[in-house]
């Protein structure tokens, strides 16, 4: 494949994770469509404007919201966790598009993986930290 042909069919990949959600994000030059698991993004995110804005935030920061189509395969977790995973995947894919994008994305915190996850339940306890009532006598 020649250099010109490869630049026209440029596809940029990014993987994002949050809690138990994993999103494999593909950025393709286009008009700004969002497709998640073969469904329109607004439908998949249950028409929640905050989640839709969160997913597109890295693109809007760089002024590229109408330059790339976002194609996503997401699994695990719930809608909120998947939205955060998609946001991280989009930011990582934008770093592949142009390494100069890394600076602004990093200062806004879009390249940080949120490490918080559910703490496991321990035996002898009711929940992760809740102990049964203690009676001295």
Swiss-Prot record:
SUPFAM superfamilies xref list: Ribosomal protein S5 domain 2-like
Region (Disordered) location: 105-137
NCBIfam families per the UniProt record, alphabetical: PRK00132.1 (NF001099)
GO MF annotations, alphabetized: RNA binding; structural constituent of ribosome
Family per similarity comment: Belongs to the universal ribosomal protein uS9 family.
Protein name per Swiss-Prot or TrEMBL: Small ribosomal subunit protein uS9
Pfam families noted in UniProt: Ribosomal_S9
Gene3D superfamilies: 3.30.230.10
Biased composition (Basic and acidic residues): 109-122
GO CC annotations on file: cytoplasm; small ribosomal subunit
The keyword Aminoacyl-tRNA synthetase is annotated on this UniProt entry: no
Record lineage: Bacteria, Bacillati, Cyanobacteriota, Cyanophyceae, Synechococcales
Listed GO biological process terms: translation
Composition-biased stretches (Basic residues): 123-137
InterPro entries referenced in this protein's UniProt entry, alphabetically: Ribosomal_Su5_D2-typ_SF, Ribosomal_uS9, Ribosomal_uS9_bac/plastid, Ribosomal_uS9_CS, Ribsml_uS5_D2-typ_fold_subgr
Recorded name of the encoding gene: rpsI
Alphabetically ordered keywords of this record: Ribonucleoprotein, Ribosomal protein
Superkingdom of origin: Bacteria
